[in-house]
Each structure stands twice: as structure tokens, then as C-alpha cells.
């Protein structure tokens, strides 16, 4: 037989951004508890609002199933005394397992006999186990938590009520003075207490008290009301999953309404208006069918349709004050020139160990010009780099960015255009912050891409130089994001920038600037390792086999686009019939070539057979062609070498007793191995 179980944690209003993750955590912890306690169950449903986290477990068994358990005890030589009687160790084991010593048996495990017992365990009633769920509730962790009253428990918000019901039976436990019951609380203003007769009644009982406990139903209700308003007003309300998720978790009983603001505010930059509405007020902006922003907004009320006009006027008043402030900030910003803004950057500390923003911009300028040289950019392009890196952070001192930090770069672009900067420079000011997430949009212009790479690499290496590095999950300065973003941009542009050399030169630059606390060699090695680990993440995102990732990163990790191409091509051909014998042959070359001693050059006059000459000829052709070959052509060239390599090893004793012959043969293999290892560490690839 089975019953349903309901667990509700009633709380003061939680931050909306943590509601969904918290209820999913509760679901997992309850699922794990049921599994650990060997209680069978059916479907688990989750419900959540800003004031409650709930799981409803359907079909929970009324008792654990009876089961047979085995337990291993001490070895036989310890379990029996000299007279063959049970020792204290054996008797203690039997007592701990609650079995009669007569039930003990022996079992051979890898040549050693141990005591074993088999015992039938009678399942306990579920209702006697459920009170221990109190530990599940109190063990939850949250990004933010608090104490309240005299309690030691830290929780996302104070617990106000608890429900724990196994069908009609209330499961008793208590947390911070709150005892479980079958009574929930309805909407804070519209509802009353709700008595739950049995778990399956829970959603409807709360709905009667103006609480939609199913988050997906609340979200769908909001979407339907938005679409209805769109149709009625001939508006366009653009989909915004993040905002929709947030407002869903801000309300218990959603009602959509609209409001208006003065048309003159449309003269503000659209981004300022939208950010004011979305980020500060959680309003949906309204557009015409042509995509133009309109002087209206849509919001979601936590309540019913009563007095919507009054609610709308209240929201309009709040937004009007926000927009008035934004307009003032914008007008003040327009009075300031870019040069005046740049002058203020020397008073803003980037980091206490890395100087001011002005000093950082100068370092980034050097890095950007270095990268431009590697890419053979023209003098005109370099002049754009100089102008850009002299000003690209200027909007950080503007009033709008001070009020709306998320508009950094965007406002820089707008202000730069208004003050007559080149469009390419203005665009790069915005793009240098990209990507702003793991899968975020990349810069679309060359100048924006270059400055984004330079800024991110200088940030990354600068912090490493002063021994500030990510540890575990802690990365307060976003260095993983900087590294990942820089490599994504390099890959997307296909720029063959020699990363190891660039890292070395930036570290030397930081040393010259006086902003380094560690030996240069240590910093260079740590940054290289850090970037290699970020490369692993990128390659894993391309679904590359782990052994192939190890192989290409163990090869030449210097040029990122080529490395990624090598990994993808090896991965694509890993199942080809020729792949295994080719990798085996190349790996054999690399392995034996490790015995080569420096200083010996290949002398064809010492060849004793045609197979040495054939391999030498193939190697000479490879040397001549290699630089002009594509990645796939290089792999095919290695594959074409396979039969020649096999024939060479079948007919040539590399480790000859004659040192001159041996060293000559090792020199030949070493030259070939240098090409192979640049492509990948072939012996890392699993072909078995």
C-alpha cells in the first residue's frame, strides 16, 4: 500500500532569484533521503512561491520492504581462538549485527576467509522514519542566509510555518520553535489560512486562498495575460525569459496591468529606458509592431483585478521619478567631454596592487599594439588602437553608468558617437566587454575583438603577477571568464596569435611596470597552465574525446585556432580504419626518439638500407611541404608515412651496438618526432 506525502516550508519572502534553485534542492534532498532509507515512491512534484518551498511525493510506500542484507566481519584467523571457539572480535561482530553467533559463516575473498552473515531485515513503517526529514529541511544551503531570533539555524529567510503530512497523518517535528501541522497560509492580503485535509488537496486549497503554488502555471498565466494585452492594444511585448522567471517568483497570484509615462522621456537612449523599467522596476517595455519603444509599460501585480487603475497610477509615479533621475544624469553627462571624463580615470583605482584605470589603459595599449604587430595591421589601424585605448573606459565616470553599471560600454559607444569619434572606435568601446557570459555574443569587429582580447589578457596576467588567482569556486575578479572570453574571440577570428610568446611578453611588461610579486618564470608557467585548463573546457564544449584533448594540449598549445582544429580533425577521424595503425606508428617514433642525444645531425651516408633512405626522403618532403599544409593535410601526410615507418622498424635495428649508427637513426626519428609532437602527443590517444 502507498500514501501521498506533503512537505511545505513556509517562509518570509525569499529573493526571487533563489526560489527555483531552492525548491529543486529540496526535491533532490528528499529524493536522496527516500532512496537512502529504501522507501519506494512514485512521482515527486514541486511547488514554490516567494513564501513557500513544497514537495508532494505521490505513491510513497507505507513501510520499507523486507530485505536480506549481508555484512562482512573479521578474518577467520581473528574470529576463532586457539581452541576453535568464537573470539571476542567475532562475538562483538555478531552482537553489532543483532544475530546469533550460530548464524555466522565464512566466505573466501581472494584467498582469505572472512566472517559473513546474511540476515533478514524487517522494513520499518514509513511514518516512524519521516520525522527525521527535519534534518533534510535544516541541512539546506543557500547563496544568502540569515539568523533570526535566538536560533542557531541559518536559512534563506525565517521559517514561519511547516506542513508534513502522510495522507491525513501529521508527521511531528519542530524547527526553530515552529511545529508541523496541516495548516498553510494563503495570499498575504487576499487569503486566509488553508487547512490541508490530504496532500493531493494542496494546490486547490491554496488556490482558494489566492495562491497559485505551481510556478509553471503562474508563468503561463503571466504569458497568456501579456499576449492578451498585446492583442488588445496592438502592442509588442518582447519575450524576456530572465524577467519572466523573476516576476513569476515575485508573486503568488499574478495579474498583469499596464501603465504610461511621458513621451518626452523617449528622447533618452532606449537602453536607459529599458534598463530603468526592467532592472529597477521589473516592468516589461512595450514596443510598436514596427519595433519602436512606446511610452507604456507592463507590470505584474501580486493580487487580483481590483483597483488596477490605482495600482497603475502608483507604478507610474515610481517610474516617473526613476526616469526623471535618469534624464538628469543623461543631461549632465552630455555636458562632459570625453577628455574630461578620461582625466577622472586617474583617480579611480583598478586594484590596489595594479594601479589606477589610467595605468591599466596604458598597459592594455601596449598589449593591443603588440597583438596588432602579430596580425600585420597597418599604421592607420594602430592609430585607431592608440585613440581607442586612450579613452575606452571613459564612460565609467559618467552618471548614467554610475546609476546603471550594466550599461557600461553601451553608453560609452553612444557618448563617443555624439562627440564625433569614429564609428569603429565607438563600437569597440562597447564590444570590449564582450562576451559577458560563457555563451555570450562575441565582438563583431576586428578592432572590438582586438581590444577585448588585450583587455582580458592584461587583466588576467596582471592579477597572476600579484598572486591573485582563482581558487576553487572563488573567482572574484572573473579571471576564468576573462581567459575563456579571450580564447573564444581568438578562435572565432582564426587569429594565429602565438599565445606562449604573448604571455611571456605581457609578464615582462608587468615586471617593467613594477606590478609583479612572483618570479617571472612562475607567473608564465601558472598562466600557461590556467589557459590550458580553459582550453580543455572549450574543447569539451566541442565534444572532443578526453584523450584527444590531452594529446593536442600536450602538443603545441601556442596557436589556439590551430589547436582546436587539430582536436576536431583527430576526433572526426578517430573511427577511421587507418587511424589506429597510424597513431601506433607515430607513437612508436616519438617514444624511441626520446633516447636521442642533442647535437647529432642526420647523415644519409650512414644509412645501411633502403628503408632508412625512404624514411629520410619522406621526412625531407614533409619539411618542405609542412608550413603550407592545412591541418587535415598534415594529418593525411602523417597517415601516408605509416607504411614507411612500419617498414623502417621491421628492417632497421635503431638501438644498434654501433653508436654512430644508433645515434644517426635516433637523430632521424627525433626530427620526425618534432613534427609529430607539434601536431599532438600521439601516445596520449587511446586506440586500444
Curated annotation (Swiss-Prot):
GO BP: glycyl-tRNA aminoacylation
Protein name (record): Glycine--tRNA ligase beta subunit
Catalytic activity: tRNA(Gly) + glycine + ATP = glycyl-tRNA(Gly) + AMP + diphosphate
SUPFAM superfamilies: HD-domain/PDEase-like (SSF109604)
Subunit structure and binding partners: Tetramer of two alpha and two beta subunits.
GO cellular component: cytosol
Localisation: Cytoplasm
Domain of life: Bacteria
Predominant cellular place of this UniProt entry's protein: cytoplasm
InterPro entries: Gly-tRNA-synth_bsu, Gly-tRNA-synth_heterodimer
Species this protein is from: Listeria monocytogenes serovar 1/2a (strain ATCC BAA-679 / EGD-e)
Alphabetic keyword roster: Aminoacyl-tRNA synthetase, ATP-binding, Cytoplasm, Ligase, Nucleotide-binding, Protein biosynthesis
Upper taxonomic lineage: Bacteria, Bacillati, Bacillota, Bacilli, Bacillales
Enzyme Commission identifier(s): 6.1.1.14
GO MF assignments: ATP binding; glycine-tRNA ligase activity
Family designation: Belongs to the class-II aminoacyl-tRNA synthetase family.
Amino acid at each position: 500500500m502507498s500514501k501521498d506525502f506533503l512537505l511545505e516550508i513556509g517562509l518570509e519572502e525569499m529573493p526571487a532569484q533563489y526560489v527555483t534553485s531552492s525548491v529543486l534542492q529540496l526535491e533532490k534532498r528528499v529524493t536522496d533521503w527516500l532512496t537512502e532509507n529504501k522507501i519506494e515512491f512514485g512521482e515527486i512534484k514541486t511547488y514554490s512561491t516567494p513564501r513557500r518551498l513544497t514537495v508532494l511525493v505521490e505513491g510513497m510506500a507505507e513501510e520499507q520492504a523486507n530485505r536480506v542484507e549481508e555484512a562482512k566481519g573479521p578474518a577467520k584467523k581473528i574470529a576463532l581462538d586457539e581452541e576453535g571457539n568464537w573470539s571476542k572480535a567475532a562475538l562483538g561482530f555478531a552482537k553489532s549485527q543483532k544475530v546469533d553467533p550460530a548464524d555466522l559463516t565464512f566466505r573466501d575473498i581472494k584467498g582469505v576467509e572472512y566472517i559473513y552473515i546474511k540476515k533478514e531485515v524487517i522494513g520499518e513503517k514509513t511514518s516512524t522514519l519521516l520525522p527525521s526529514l527535519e534534518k533534510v529541511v535544516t541541512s539546506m544551503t543557500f547563496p544568502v542566509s540569515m539568523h533570526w531570533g535566538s536560533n542557531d539555524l541559518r536559512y534563506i529567510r525565517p521559517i514561519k510555518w511547516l506542513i508534513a503530512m502522510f495522507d491525513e497523518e501529521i508527521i511531528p517535528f519542530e524547527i526553530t520553535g515552529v511545529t508541523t501541522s496541516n495548516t498553510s497560509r494563503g495570499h498575504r492580503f487576499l487569503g486566509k489560512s488553508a487547512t490541508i485535509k490530504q496532500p493531493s488537496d494542496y494546490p486547490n486549497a491554496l488556490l482558494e486562498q489566492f495562491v497559485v503554488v505551481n510556478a509553471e502555471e503562474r508563468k503561463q498565466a503571466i504569458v497568456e495575460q501579456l499576449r492578451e494585452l498585446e492583442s488588445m492594444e496592438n502592442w509588442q511585448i518582447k519575450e524576456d525569459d530572465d524577467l519572466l522567471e523573476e516576476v513569476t517568483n515575485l508573486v503568488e497570484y499574478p495579474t498583469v496591468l499596464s501603465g504610461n509615462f511621458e513621451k518626452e522621456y523617449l528622447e533618452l537612449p532606449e537602453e536607459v529606458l529599458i534598463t530603468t523599467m526592467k532592472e529597477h522596476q521589473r516592468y516589461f517595455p512595450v514596443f510598436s509592431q514596427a519595433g519602436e519603444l512606446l511610452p507604456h509599460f507592463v507590470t505584474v501585480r501580486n493580487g487580483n483585478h481590483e483597483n488596477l487603475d490605482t495600482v497603475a497610477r502608483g507604478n507610474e509615479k515610481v517610474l516617473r521619478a526613476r526616469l526623471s533621475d535618469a534624464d538628469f544624469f543623461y543631461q549632465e553627462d552630455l555636458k562632459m567631454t570625453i577628455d574630461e571624463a578620461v582625466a577622472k580615470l586617474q583617480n579611480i583605482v583598478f586594484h590596489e596592487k595594479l594601479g589606477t584605470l589610467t595605468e591599466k589603459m596604458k598597459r592594455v595599449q601596449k598589449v593591443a599594439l603588440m597583438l596588432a604587430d602579430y596580425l600585420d595591421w597597418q599604421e592607420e589601424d594602430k592609430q585607431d588602437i592608440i585613440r581607442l585605448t586612450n579613452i575606452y573606459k571613459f564612460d565609467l565616470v559618467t552618471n548614467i553608468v554610475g546609476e546603471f553599471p550594466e550599461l557600461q560600454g553601451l553608453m560609452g559607444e553612444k557618448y563617443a558617437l555624439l562627440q564625433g569619434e569614429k564609428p569603429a572606435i565607438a563600437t569597440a568601446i562597447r564590444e570590449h566587454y564582450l562576451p559577458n557570459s560563457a555563451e555570450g555574443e562575441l565582438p563583431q569587429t576586428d578592432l572590438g575583438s582586438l581590444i577585448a582580447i588585450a583587455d582580458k589578457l592584461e587583466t588576467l596576467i596582471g592579477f597572476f603577477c600579484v598572486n591573485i588567482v582563482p581558487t576553487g569556486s572563488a573567482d572574484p575578479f572573473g579571471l576564468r571568464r576573462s581567459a575563456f572570453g579571450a580564447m573564444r574571440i581568438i578562435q572565432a577570428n582564426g587569429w594565429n596569435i602565438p599565445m606562449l610568446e604573448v604571455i611571456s611578453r605581457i609578464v615582462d611588461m608587468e615586471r617593467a611596470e613594477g606590478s609583479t610579486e612572483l618570479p617571472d618564470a612562475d607567473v608564465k608557467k601558472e598562466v600557461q597552465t590556467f589557459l590550458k585548463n580553459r582550453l580543455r573546457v572549450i574543447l569539451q564544449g566541442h565534444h572532443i574525446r578526453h584523450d584527444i584533448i590531452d594529446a593536442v594540449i600536450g602538443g603545441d598549445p601556442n596557436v589556439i585556432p590551430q589547436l582546436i582544429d587539430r582536436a576536431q580533425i583527430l576526433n572526426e577521424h578517430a573511427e577511421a580504419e587507418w587511424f589506429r595503425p597510424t597513431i601506433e606508428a607515430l607513437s612508436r617514433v616519438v617514444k624511441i626518439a626520446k633516447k636521442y642525444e642533442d647535437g647529432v645531425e642526420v647523415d644519409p651516408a650512414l644509412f645501411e638500407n633502403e628503408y632508412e633512405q625512404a624514411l629520410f626522403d619522406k621526412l625531407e618532403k614533409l619539411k618542405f611541404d609542412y608550413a603550407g599544409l592545412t591541418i587535415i593535410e598534415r594529418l593525411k601526410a602523417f597517415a601516408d608515412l605509416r607504411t614507411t615507418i612500419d617498414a623502417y622498424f621491421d628492417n632497421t635495428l635503431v638501438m644498434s651496438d654501433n653508436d654512430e649508427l644508433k645515434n644517426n637513426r635516433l637523430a632521424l626519428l627525433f626530427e620526425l618526432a618534432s613534427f609529430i609532437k607539434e601536431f599532438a602527443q600521439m601516445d596520449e590517444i587511446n586506440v586500444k
